[in-house]
């Protein structure tokens, strides 16, 4: 078996990726989220496949088909709840995974990081088109508001929006194409994940200290396979608890009403995992400005490697940068809260301040902190 594992063309790839892979001996539980994201993706693809067998992408029957899945299909309610809450678990793991990358300086593996940012954008696009499919009130109005932002692009905006819609508003053509996108994108994500891992295995994993770990490595199996298995158990337990005990707690009550173009919900908002970006979008009282800020809030991740000024890679021994990092984390939670609030005083000003602080921290304060820490570490004569 050992020889087969090391000689068979397919087994050899698996062996070098998951069995005999040399891994740093000191990586903590923060390194579990990559494998957890893999499990989330598999769960989403499997549950999504079974949902697609019963779903109809037509404006007249989409809402009813989702109700039919929950009422009449064997374990349809469970599959639907796992799929809807699986998305929340996916994004929770994603945000923690990105946060880990920022804290420990993993972004200095530029290729891996850039593919990761593309993955994040692709997953966000997939979740957005997926949220439209049940064709409830929030599905319809969320799609209308977000796709309408394209019309803010000068000259080609209106044409582009109508091209995406397949008409003059969000309608049957939009729903059909969004279903097609939602079906194909997870497979594109799978391909990108393979590229992400390919680049990661070129350099090997980073570790909490940020120091080159080549002198002290251990095989991935059994050490990290067992450690990952523990993470899987926690993830599946949390997902099952959420799907079985409070499946609708993260959704919007408006989505229990069928889509009605003549009746606008009192407060249009996306799912919780988009609220931070939605708050940044709303904090600028100009359509094009808001769209640019929304894009910048995610694309700013691409320039983080170029803003690294510290002599040390990880924040483990950099208390000032650590403090700023946790302020950034708290700020993102604040933005998430603001995104779910109505547009009125004092939420408007809080959102504007939090949005400003978000860009200020990443673009100015954190690079300055790195330079200051370098200065503090210089031997004084």
Curated annotation (Swiss-Prot):
Record-level Gene Ontology MF annotations: metal ion binding; ubiquinol-cytochrome-c reductase activity
Entry annotated with the keyword Methyltransferase: no
InterPro entries to which the protein is assigned, alphabetical: Cyt_b/b6_C, Cyt_b/b6_C_sf, Cyt_b/b6_N, Cytb/b6-like_sf, Cytochrome_b, Cytochrome_b_C_euk/bac, Cytochrome_b_N_euk/bac, Di-haem_cyt_TM
Residues engaged in binding heme b b562: 83, 182
Cystine bridges: none
Cofactor(s) the record lists: heme b
Residues involved in a ubiquinone binding: 201
Main location: mitochondrion
Binding site for heme b b566: 97, 196
Chain segments annotated as transmembrane: 33-53, 77-98, 113-133, 178-198, 226-246, 288-308, 320-340, 347-367
Protein's cellular compartments: Mitochondrion inner membrane
Lipid bilayer topology: Multi-pass membrane protein
Subunit structure and binding partners: The cytochrome bc1 complex contains 11 subunits: 3 respiratory subunits (MT-CYB, CYC1 and UQCRFS1), 2 core proteins (UQCRC1 and UQCRC2) and 6 low-molecular weight proteins (UQCRH/QCR6, UQCRB/QCR7, UQCRQ/QCR8, UQCR10/QCR9, UQCR11/QCR10 and a cleavage product of UQCRFS1). This cytochrome bc1 complex then forms a dimer.
Note: Heme 1 (or BL or b562) is low-potential and absorbs at about 562 nm, and heme 2 (or BH or b566) is high-potential and absorbs at about 566 nm.
Full protein name: Cytochrome b
């Amino acid at each position: 078996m050992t020889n087969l594992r090391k000689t068979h063309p397919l087994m050899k790839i698996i062996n070098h990726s998951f069995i005999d892979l040399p891994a740093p001996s000191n990586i903590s539980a923060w390194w579990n989220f990559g494998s957890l994201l893999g499990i989330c993706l598999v769960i989403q693809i499997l549950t999504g496949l079974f949902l697609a067998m019963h779903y109809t992408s037509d404006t007249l029957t989409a809402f009813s088909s989702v109700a039919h899945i929950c009422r009449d299909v064997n374990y349809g309610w469970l599959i639907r709840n796992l799929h809807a809450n699986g998305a929340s678990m996916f994004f929770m793991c994603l945000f923690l995974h990105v946060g880990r990358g920022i804290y420990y300086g993993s972004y200095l593996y530029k290729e891996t990081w850039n593919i990761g940012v593309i993955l994040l954008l692709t997953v966000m696009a997939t979740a957005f088109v997926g949220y439209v499919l049940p064709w409830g009130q929030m599905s319809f109005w969320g799609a209308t508001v977000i796709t309408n932002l394209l019309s803010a692009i000068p000259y080609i905006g209106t044409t582009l929006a109508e091209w995406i819609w397949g008409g003059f508003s969000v309608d049957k053509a939009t729903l059909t194409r969004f279903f097609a996108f939602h079906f194909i994108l997870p497979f594109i994500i799978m391909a990108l994940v393979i590229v992400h891992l390919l680049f990661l295995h070129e350099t090997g994993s980073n570790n909490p200290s940020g120091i080159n770990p080549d002198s002290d490595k251990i095989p991935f199996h059994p050490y990290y396979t067992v450690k990952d298995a523990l993470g899987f158990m926690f993830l599946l337990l949390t997902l099952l608890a959420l799907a079985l005990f409070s499946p609708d707690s993260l959704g919007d009550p408006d989505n229990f009403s069928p889509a009605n173009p003549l009746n606008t919900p009192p407060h249009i908002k996306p799912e919780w995992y988009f609220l931070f970006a939605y708050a940044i979008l709303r904090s600028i009282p100009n359509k094009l400005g808001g769209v640019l800020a929304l894009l910048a809030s995610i694309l700013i991740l691409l320039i983080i490697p170029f803003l690294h000024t510290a002599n040390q890679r990880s924040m483990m021994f950099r208390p000032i940068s650590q403090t700023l990092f946790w302020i950034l984390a708290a700020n993102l939670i604040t933005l998430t809260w603001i995104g779910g609030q109505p547009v009125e005083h004092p939420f408007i000003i809080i959102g504007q301040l939090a949005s400003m602080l978000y860009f200020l921290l990443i673009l100015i304060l954190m690079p300055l902190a790195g330079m200051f820490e370098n200065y503090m570490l210089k031997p004084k004569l």
